[in-house]
Curated annotation (Swiss-Prot):
GO cellular component terms listed in the entry, alphabetical order: cytoplasm; endopeptidase Clp complex
Catalytic site positions: S108, H133
Keywords for this protein: Cytoplasm, Hydrolase, Protease, Serine protease
Catalytically driven reaction(s): Hydrolysis of proteins to small peptides in the presence of ATP and magnesium. alpha-casein is the usual test substrate. In the absence of ATP, only oligopeptides shorter than five residues are hydrolyzed (such as succinyl-Leu-Tyr-|-NHMec, and Leu-Tyr-Leu-|-Tyr-Trp, in which cleavage of the -Tyr-|-Leu- and -Tyr-|-Trp bonds also occurs)
UniProt-listed PANTHER family: ATP-DEPENDENT CLP PROTEASE PROTEOLYTIC SUBUNIT
Protein name (record): ATP-dependent Clp protease proteolytic subunit 1
Subunit description: Fourteen ClpP subunits assemble into 2 heptameric rings which stack back to back to give a disk-like structure with a central cavity, resembling the structure of eukaryotic proteasomes.
Gene3D superfamilies the UniProt entry points to: 2-enoyl-CoA Hydratase, Chain A, domain 1
Enzyme class of the recorded protein, top EC level: hydrolase
Pfam families: CLP_protease
Length: 217
């Protein structure tokens, strides 16, 4: 098994989605530099590949320093619930505080991961847009299969609602009602709802002093 390192590794590089421009060596260099500054960037849909990369980066940074905060920057349309929950569980597993920042677009599982950052350390840029909705899935097969899939979907929906309620201060009933259809939030509205703690415009408001020194700022 190849050990995790702070240098670039293919498993840690952003995944190009169909139709996207494939990552260049310059992109790989940027990803490595961000990782060296304890910044994890989720800039694609949430799937098994991107979740494995984010989980690996979180574990790596925690192994290097179990006390300094890690920043998770999110610009994602969402995606797989199970992949997103893997990231959430890893955030809970490590002793570090993981701050979150919405930049551009945080929808569905992107919104969920934004909301579950460390208390007091969940941020959004002024023009970020956040969208919440309930999990969905294609259901098919035999009657028995459909029943099993429906039960699993309901279980997952309840888990997401419970966790979101814990981190936003809203009730599970409110989360269920508001997520029944796509609901859009501005950065300020997300703050009022409890998804983020602050709307920020400066790096000084996001990065701890020790991290800024590491970046030479």
């Amino acid at each position: 098994m190849t050990p995790l390192t702070t240098g670039w590794h293919p498993a840690l590089s952003p995944r190009a989605e169909e139709g996207d421009t494939p990552p260049s060596r310059f992109d790989d260099h940027l990803a490595a530099q961000l990782l060296a500054q304890r910044i994890v960037l989720l800039g694609t849909q949430v799937d098994e590949v991107s979740a494995n990369r984010v989980c690996a980066q979180l574990l790596l940074l925690s192994a290097e320093d179990s006390r300094t905060d890690i920043s998770l920057y999110i610009n994602s349309p969402g995606g797989s619930v199970t992949a997103g929950l893997a990231i959430y569980d890893t955030m809970r597993l490590i002793p570090n505080d993981v701050s979150t920042l919405a930049m551009g677009f945080a929808a569905s599982m992107g919104q969920f991961l934004l909301s579950v950052g460390a208390a007091g350390k969940r941020f959004a840029l002024p023009n970020a847009r956040i969208m919440m909705h309930q999990p969905s899935a294609g259901i098919g097969g035999t009657t028995a299969d459909i029943e099993i899939q429906a039960e699993n979907l309901e279980f997952t929906k309840k888990a997401i609602e419970r966790i979101t309620a814990e981190h936003t201060g809203q009730s599970e009933e409110t989360i269920s009602r508001d997520g029944d259809r796509d609901r859009w939030f501005t950065a300020e509205q997300a703050k009022e709802y409890g998804m983020v703690d602050r709307v920020v415009e400066s790096l000084d408001d996001v990065r701890p002093t020790a991290s800024r020194r590491r970046m030479g700022l």
